[in-house]
Amino acid sequence: IKTLNSKFYSSTNEYLKNTIKELNKNTFDIVEVHNRPNMINELIEKVNSKYVLYLHNDPRSMKGTKTPKERLNLLSKVDKIIFITKWVKNKFFEDLNLDSNHYKCEIIYHSIEKERKILKKEKKIVFVGKLNESKGYDIFCDATKKLLDSHKNWKAYSIGDEKRIKTYSTHPRHIVLGYMPNKKVLTFLNKSEIAVIPSRWEEPFGRTALEASSRGCATIISDRGGLPETTDEAIILEKLNAKTLKNKIENLIVNTKLRKIIQSK
């Protein structure tokens, strides 16, 4: 099936209409629908196939799965629902009088190939993501500003951008690199000692934590959403504030043995 032009961005109805048209030109055993539960009913009515729905975000925030009634209806119609974390699955079953171990439901985590050749690590503390408070960027700035004066050989780096960027007070050795393609991000992580993901918002998954751990970073994360499910090796912040983050980073800086143990897992 050909890739449809980005009709979705101008008209969901037009996109759905074109999708149905293209699907009916062929015969498919299974149709996968990613994050578009509001399209399921019409697809099932007009295209004969089995349907697997992948949910990548909080279902309660999406058209078609916001209410318990909508979620029950969806569960009765599709053949399978795949969740990217247990957290997303739990949100789907919230307020439903059903066992979450439903036979139609399954969790499949995102994965990444672990880098076997870890480059020589440099004294870098890195933040990757949108440079906003939702991602905890202000917490990272405050923590490293207080930290770097005491650890002269270390530097902090931020990779990412933000359209409505707010000016944050940073340390002179905190370098903002801006947007980078994913391949370059992975290379940068491979050279970095410590990665920090201090998100305030409920991350459905948190790919950066997975990528950082796979590249041998000692990784610090918040406990929001599905973030704790992304890696077994990360240090989880009990309190999400600059003081706690500073202390966690500092412990990794001064305790080389602990840092290397976490990096090697």
Predicted features along the sequence, with ranges:
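Acidic donor-binding loop of glycosyltransferase active sites
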Residues: 190-204, 217
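Short His-centered aromatic/hydrophobic patch
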Residues: 33-38, 55
